[in-house]
Amino acid sequence: MNELDKNYSPNEIEEKWYKIWEDSKYFAASLSSEKENYSIVIPPPNVTGILHMGHVLNNSIQDTLIRYNRMTGKNTLWMPGCDHAGIATQNKVERKLAEDGLKKEDIGREKFLEMTWDWKEKYGGIITKQLRKLGASLDWDRERFTMDEGLSYAVRKIFNDLYHDGLIYQGEYMVNWCPSCGTALADDEVDHEEKDGHLWQIKYPVKDSDEYIIIATSRPETMLADVAVAVHPEDERYKHLIGKTLILPLVNREIPVIADEYVDKEFGTGALKITPAHDPNDYNLGKKYNLPIINMLTPDGKIVEDYPKYAGLDRFEARKKIVEDLKAQDLFIKTEHLHHAVGQCYRCQTVIEPRVSPQWFVKMKPLAEKALEVVRNGEVKILPKRMEKIYYNWLENIRDWCISRQIWWGHRIPAWYGPDRHVFVAMDEAEAKEQAKKHYGHDVELSQEEDVLDTWFSSALWPFSTMGWPEKTKELDLFYPTNTLVTGADIIFFWVARMIMFGMYELKKIPFKNVFFHGIVRDEIGRKMSKSLGNSPDPLDLIKEYGVDAIRFSMIYNTSQGQDVHFSTDLLGMGRNFANKIWNATRFVIMNLKGFDVKSVDKTKLDYELVDKWIISRLNETAKDVKDCLEKFELDNAAKAVYEFLRGDFCDWYVEIAKIRLYNDDEDKKISKLTAQYMLWTILEQGLRLLHPFMPFITEEIWQKIKVDGDTIMLQQYPVADDSLIDVKIEKSFEYIKEVVSSLRNIRAEKGISPAKPAKVVVSTSNSEELETLEKNELFIKKLANLEELTCGTDLEAPSQSSLRVAGNSSVYMILTGLLNNEAEIKKINEQLAKLEKELEPVNRKLSDEKFTSKAPQHIIDRELRIQKEYQDKIKKLKESLKSFEE
């Protein structure tokens, strides 16, 4: 046995072991293994991202599952990779350009893309290095990037297939537009936040009349693009104006008054301005009545040149100016408060603008049907189960997906335009030219679509594109469908549902069998962690302070299935203390195994005490519990089971009792000592295996010091429960001993008696099994509780001046004579009695008051009665204690 350093220094061992693991190819999946296969694909982090606490939780969970399945003898693949993150990455590069006073248009598309690839090469490896620091046992030789050539080919293939199957179409429609990112967004990329705003009431004069219609709007700047005013056909206020012409304020454009039942007579003034270019509902009304579409905003949210007075103003600046001008022309009535949901870009939180523009869409309903079916029939299992309802609701009400983005970084849409704008969708330009030649009868010049695909489009192929699809590969045969997807609930629509759709569409197979949604990591007061709030600690700083194992274990231990995690650094102290406890217990074990050779032990000659049988039973029970919990994705309960076994059962009890046997060198106790040594080694070695998936570094370091065979703990068999060794009767007997010892320790703590002072104890029990257990384990109890005398029997009298506790069916008395200052104790008890009796008085008065008891609700009376009984019980116990001191 090799000794451990005195102090546990996690940072030193982490770097050492990760390098050994990676260099030794322990993480690599085999393509020729006869073992059962188990696979997970990583939710690809943004290529320019850095590790945050959400990554820590997500990857700690995945690594725990992978390491557990690897140790159960499976051929595991954890597929690594990064996402190109179109908008996010482009924004970073554009900000870099802006430092030099440049825009991307100043350098052109080709140069900008070169610059973005350079940026990716420079910063793209940061997140993968950080995942290594976390101990993630990913198969790094298979690392993928969503814009690798193979994955790009897969994107073009599915686009072509969907298009030629009529599931991708192009058209001019109303979309969500982000003026900051300069691109369209899908519906689910818009976050709706409740905000306080205003309704402005404006006069719209009737042509050739003194009358006017009052319009209420939350976006007065859009009036520049109004083309009509709609009223309800049955609204008596406006019936006489239907068909009349209004003069649009400030613009002086003539617009009609139309009637439609869509208008809500009760909202605002009951008159609705129609702006088809800037509101989805108005857009639909505009199409219905064949109204013109007038655009008043540039793509970056400024007023267009058609309105010289406001041209170039930002939309919100224009709003102020327009309201001022309306007031100046006596066309403004008043402002009202409005609390409403405002759509914001999920990337940059800019208020989105509805905008009519040509875009590419995927028809979602046909794809959604299969995705619904595989969850309903149980092929794909979603955990926690409550997430199924959210999944169903979204898919049952799904809208077509806008997949085109007006940015440069990403997968350029594989569509080419002929001279007359006829579209040719192909795998590459050569194929598009072949199609064009067939269409036109001769060669023509083609221009490729400028837009790129939504980042989530390529991400939806991730489980199979990373394994070589559309080629037929060994990886797909062995590892697809994957077993488990671990992800945050916030991307159930962006990513999870779409992966199922695309997997079913192209491979006719589900992409994964289980989806495990974990919660969001929040701060201790429930806020989502973010840089802007300053409440998001740098995981690398935490790793330096606490060590990776402590962080991983603490995060998993404190994360209930599907619940958000309220994080504080206080949580990490538990993990660090646990690691130190295991380290120190191991040092003790190793120091007491000098000259011990586990291979030479004849197990048939060992002398197993109750404590040995108990720890064997608990080991097997824990192995069973951990397996059940991990397979149900209750990782927190699995971690708690390992913690309670190693910290509680092993360190706090077994090791302490083992000391009694280890320090006894009597000739007739040699077998007892050898048994204790063998059990310490066995339980520690098996316990390290149990703990390894959660805390890989410390377990490897310790295991290497005590191992008999093998190169690494990660390839050892995970402990398998032997039900025949789980003995409920044995456990009950030892739990009784723990209860007796704990009750005596509690008396010392409550009475302020030093643990170093030997005590006299009387245990009276009517239970023969308890009495037998006491008699057989008297030595252990006396040592653990520091007793000079232990008297056990049936129906023994309570000693005077003693403190009583109950353990099982036994009355446990600690004789306080000589341990306490009697006068001081009597004084303390009298003070406590006086305080409790004073607090009880108003409760008694209330319950003896007929007015209260006749009028108060029954649950209030019951509460007061419960309080009264609690006080009475406390007073009774104190009086009994006082009596024992006065005897």
Swiss-Prot record:
Parts forming coiled coils: 817-887
UniProt xrefs under InterPro entries: aa-tRNA-synth_I_CS (IPR001412), aa-tRNA-synth_Ia (IPR002300), Anticodon_Ia_Val (IPR033705), M/V/L/I-tRNA-synth_anticd-bd (IPR013155), Rossmann-like_a/b/a_fold (IPR014729), tRNA-bd_arm (IPR010978), tRNAsynth_Ia_anticodon-bd (IPR009080), Val-tRNA_synth_C_sf (IPR037118)
Name of one Pfam family that matches: Anticodon_1
Highest taxon of source: Bacteria
GO annotation, biological process: valyl-tRNA aminoacylation
Keyword terms of this UniProt record: Aminoacyl-tRNA synthetase, ATP-binding, Coiled coil, Cytoplasm, Ligase, Nucleotide-binding, Protein biosynthesis
Ranges spanned by the short sequence motif 'KMSKS' region, renumbered to the chain: 528-532
Motif 'HIGH' region: chain residues: 45-55
Any GO MF annotation of the entry: valine-tRNA ligase activity
Location in the cell: Cytoplasm
Reaction catalyzed: tRNA(Val) + L-valine + ATP = L-valyl-tRNA(Val) + AMP + diphosphate
Transmembrane domains' residue ranges: none
Gene3D superfamilies named in the record: HUPs, Isoleucyl-tRNA Synthetase, Domain 1, Valyl-tRNA synthetase, C-terminal domain
One cellular component (GO) term of this entry: cytosol
Residues binding ATP, per UniProt: K531
Enzyme Commission (EC) number: 6.1.1.9
UniProt keyword Coiled coil, yes or no: yes
Annotated domain remarks: ValRS has two distinct active sites: one for aminoacylation and one for editing. The misactivated threonine is translocated from the active site to the editing site. The C-terminal coiled-coil domain is crucial for aminoacylation activity.
PANTHER family found in the cross-reference section: VALINE--TRNA LIGASE, CHLOROPLASTIC_MITOCHONDRIAL 2, VALYL-TRNA SYNTHETASES
Family the entry assigns: Belongs to the class-I aminoacyl-tRNA synthetase family. ValS type 1 subfamily.
HAMAP family: Val_tRNA_synth_type1 (MF_02004)
Subunit relationships: Monomer.
Function, as annotated: Catalyzes the attachment of valine to tRNA(Val). As ValRS can inadvertently accommodate and process structurally similar amino acids such as threonine, to avoid such errors, it has a 'posttransfer' editing activity that hydrolyzes mischarged Thr-tRNA(Val) in a tRNA-dependent manner.
Protein name: Valine--tRNA ligase
Originating species: Fusobacterium nucleatum subsp. nucleatum (strain ATCC 25586 / DSM 15643 / BCRC 10681 / CIP 101130 / JCM 8532 / KCTC 2640 / LMG 13131 / VPI 4355)
Gene transcribed to yield this protein: valS
